[in-house]
Amino acid sequence: MSRPTPDPMRVKDRLRDLAGPAVMGIINATPDSFHAASRVDVDEALRVAERMLNEGAAILDIGGASSRPGAVAVAETEELKRVLPVVEALQRRFPEAWLSIDTYRSTVAREAVAAGASMVNDIGAGLLDANMIPTVAMLHVPYVLMHMQGTPQTMQANPQYHNIVHEVKDFLQQRIQAAAAAGIAENRLVI
């Protein structure tokens, strides 16, 4: 049985073929990321991005708030201060690059897209900010929905599943339905 080929995704006025896997390079503009080698300032972000793109990354994902288990939430203003200069610099240096903003906050998503990001990667799938899904629908950008129980502060405290595969599948189906109800096209969703 063959799988259907997904429709291309429109990103930065170009169609992106998602028939195969795409490598996403991670650029953390945060001092407390769980992956120390990905923590960067603006100049280092430009060097890291160039290397990642040369090595085949199709997407560069910029985050300014750690989502590692137990991470303490940073203020929205601090997250904006961390990510916007990086997004702006990457957009200037690599205008064809597919930039993703890793955030669960709708304001950060909106500002980052205005600065040059072309995709929103949301660990909360719209549950940590009630305005996220409507904002993404308004922005008309691809939206990465992820699964997490609780918040980064609590997600590993006592995760409980009776049937993890079915429960995660049900969760993601509910979030897909919420995105569709808000007007996000199916071919703009990444699960």
Spans of model-derived segments:
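Active-site mouth loops of central-metabolism enzymes
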Residues: 26-47, 72-73, 98-100, 154-166
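Glycine-rich anion/phosphate-binding loops
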Residues: 34-53, 78-82, 125-130, 166-172
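Glycine-rich, proline-tolerant flexible connector loops at the mouths of alpha/beta enzymes
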Residues: 33-35, 58-85
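Conserved anion-binding
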Residues: 29-31, 67-70, 109, 115, ...
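Short beta-strand/loop segments at the ligand-binding rim of alpha/beta enzyme cores
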Residues: 21-23, 93-102, 118-119, 185-189
